[in-house]
């Protein structure tokens, strides 16, 4: 098969992440606007006014744009749902990602392409056949193993199950990122404890906290493996992507709309490279080891295989927050870029920066640019280190803009089990 037969879908929660996804080689991006998406109140979101700009940027770079409209929708939400889908249609959004039949039906009625959300928990071919009348792409339940995915794929081909476009239904699966302890994300813990519904895009992620389990009758604290008994490790499938492709997965969805642009670029690049390696027949252990090492540098809670390989049940994180091998520390803001000589000027606002440091520069147009500092100049003179208050210049491989943020990447010691 060819690269064009597969799709890497990157998460976008900001213009910085949008540009980072493009830099990473994404084939498509998915995002939300205010209301009716599963990150509507738990992360940054765009507005309806951003739709045309996002679609235009995607069009300029030849990638598809998918808008999430996948929360539980109540009667009072129907006017807003129609308004959002109308705006998506008018702006030229490639497809909406929906979980409610009301949204699917309305989108179909106005000619807006639909993809099915994992919230539907589609676990068998009969359910897929029912929903095929609405959608051309389906995200199967995250709890399936690859044998079950392959059986559904075989039935799609055998029965010629097609969507509204008249083409065979394409299978999409989550490939990387955060996992929820609940089946297909249908969790009520946040609503119960914080009056903020995960099914309405307002998850407070209290499952990520440390807990102890107490037996009220005996007053004995139960022995559990670690305190983070409801916080799963992150999904990582890059080491068996070849098996996912062979099983019939065609769209690889990367989770992370609430994560930074450097994460988006890193993860997108690695999975895009994996697709290319598979198609060129060079997918091997050496490359897998390289991708693994790079991915450990991005935000993660430790990694496991999900349910795909059917080898074991959930694995739980052993700490709060990220287990990344590197962290970013803000040090400077962008001033000017001299395109003729490929030099960027910054002003130090915190800490220090030395020759040999790894840096990350982010911005709404710049995206996420990472490199090593080869030389620093202050007042045109080379120095080994620059500190707060100084203006300095460095060679940059890509253009930066005024007010871009420069971070120094620092190594982090992590617990062995997170690896």
Residue ranges of each PLM-predicted region?
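Well-ordered mid-protein domain cores that form the structural environment of catalytic cofactors
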Residues: 81-117
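Short, glycine/polar-rich helix-capping loops at beta-to-alpha or helix-loop-helix junctions
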Residues: 123-128
């Amino acid at each position: 098969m060819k690269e064009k037969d597969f799709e890497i879908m990157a998460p976008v929660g900001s213009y910085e992440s949008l540009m980072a996804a493009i830099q990473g080689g994404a084939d498509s991006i998915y995002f939300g606007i205010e209301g009716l998406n599963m990150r509507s109140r738990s992360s940054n979101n765009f507005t309806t006014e951003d739709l045309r700009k996002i679609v235009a940027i995607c069009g300029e770079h030849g990638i598809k744009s998918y808008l999430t409209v996948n929360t539980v929708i109540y009667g009072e939400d129907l006017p807003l749902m129609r308004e959002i889908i109308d705006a998506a249609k008018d702006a030229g959004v490639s497809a909406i990602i929906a979980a409610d039949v009301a949204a699917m039906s309305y989108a179909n009625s106005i000619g807006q392409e639909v993809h099915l959300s994992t919230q539907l928990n589609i676990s068998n071919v009969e359910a897929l056949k029912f929903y095929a009348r609405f959608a051309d792409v389906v995200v199967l339940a995250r709890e399936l193993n690859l044998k079950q995915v392959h059986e559904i794929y075989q039935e799609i081909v055998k029965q010629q199950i097609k969507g509204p476009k008249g083409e065979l239904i394409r299978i999409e699966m989550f490939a990387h990122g955060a996992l929820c302890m609940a089946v297909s994300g249908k969790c009520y813990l946040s609503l119960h404890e914080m009056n903020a519904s995960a099914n309405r895009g307002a998850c407070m992620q209290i499952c990520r906290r440390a807990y102890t389990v107490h037996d009220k009758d005996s007053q004995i604290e139960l022995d559990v493996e670690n305190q983070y008994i409801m916080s799963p490790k992150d999904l990582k499938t890059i080491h068996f992507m070849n098996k996912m492709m062979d099983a019939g997965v065609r769209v690889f969805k990367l989770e992370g709309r609430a994560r930074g642009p450097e994460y988006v670029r890193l993860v997108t690049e690695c999975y895009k490279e994996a697709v290319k390696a598979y198609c060129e027949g060079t997918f091997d252990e050496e490359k897998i080891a390289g991708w693994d090492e790079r991915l450990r540098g991005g935000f993660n809670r430790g990694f496991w295989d999900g349910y795909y390989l059917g080898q074991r049940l959930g694995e739980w994180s052993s700490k709060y927050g990220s287990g990344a091998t590197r962290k970013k520390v803000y040090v400077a803001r962008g001033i000017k870029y001299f395109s003729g000589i490929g030099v960027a000027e910054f002003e130090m606002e915190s800490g220090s920066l030395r020759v040999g440091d790894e840096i990350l520069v982010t911005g709404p147009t710049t995206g996420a640019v990472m490199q090593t500092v080869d030389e620093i100049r202050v007042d045109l003179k080379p120095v080994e280190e620059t500190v707060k208050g100084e203006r300095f210049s460095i060679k940059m491989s890509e253009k930066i803009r005024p007010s871009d943020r420069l971070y120094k990447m620092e190594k982090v010691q992590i617990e062995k089990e997170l690896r």
